[in-house]
């Protein structure tokens, strides 16, 4: 996938009072290109999580169209979506979608067993780099939110993709951990030629973005 296009897209809930200055909603043809780094800056309630859910096909309560390389995503089959989510879009939701009863490592390996993208040694190095070496066997329910966020970042990096889509990926991280995460994601994105689309309401992932879009 090379391009995600939003055409006059708007959450249905905003239909009565559409935003006047959004650089995303109601744009006649907003192209998000592979290999480009985008920050989607938003206020709370502006629809950033909705945007991510729309792009990933988890919600359809919007007007307008979303296209993948010119194809309307509403025409995609379940099989298409399984392939896209496994090979083309790596998604980190704001709620992290971790399994609290499983260990940090098991949460990561659930993904990696589907993608076979990283070795156990590579995953162990990511745990070490992100200060989670001693949390390998810890149930996610026993971790702080910031630690859970780092586990979810490691899981995100366990697949090939053309687009990294991240909803407030560092909202509970300090600046040092933010920079470490940014370096890891940027390195992986450049290796794959992937785009980064990251949302924020005030604590953005510390990247050198190509474009900042106000939601």
Stretches with model-predicted labels:
Residues 56:
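Helix-to-loop junction immediately C-terminal to a conserved catalytic motif
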Residues 73-90:
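ABC ATPase NBD coupling module
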Residues 139-147:
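Conserved ABC ATPase signature
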Residues 164-168:
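Catalytic Walker B motif of ABC-type/P-loop ATPase nucleotide-binding domains
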């Amino acid at each position: 996938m090379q391009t995600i296009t939003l055409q006059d897209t708007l959450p249905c809930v905003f239909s009565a009072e559409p935003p006047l200055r959004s650089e995303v909603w109601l744009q006649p043809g907003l192209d998000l290109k592979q290999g480009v780094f985008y920050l989607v800056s938003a206020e709370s309630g502006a629809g950033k999580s909705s945007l991510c859910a729309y792009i990933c096909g988890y919600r359809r309560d919007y007007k307008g169209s979303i296209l993948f390389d010119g194809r309307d995503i509403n025409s995609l089959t379940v099989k298409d979506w399984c392939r896209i989510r496994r090979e083309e879009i790596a998604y980190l939701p704001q709620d992290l979608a971790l399994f609290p009863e499983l260990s940090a490592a098991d949460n990561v390996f659930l993904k990696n067993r589907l993608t076979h993208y990283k070795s156990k040694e590579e995953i162990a190095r990511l745990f070490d780099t992100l200060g989670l070496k001693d949390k390998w066997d810890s149930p996610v329910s026993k971790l702080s939110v910031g630690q859970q966020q780092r586990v979810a970042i490691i899981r995100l990096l366990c697949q090939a993709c053309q687009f990294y889509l991240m909803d407030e990926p560092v909202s509970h991280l300090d600046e040092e951990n933010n920079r470490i995460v940014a370096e890891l994601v940027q390195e992986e994105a450049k290796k794959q030629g992937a785009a980064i689309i990251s949302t924020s309401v005030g604590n953005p992932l510390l990247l050198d973005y190509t474009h900042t879009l106000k939601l």
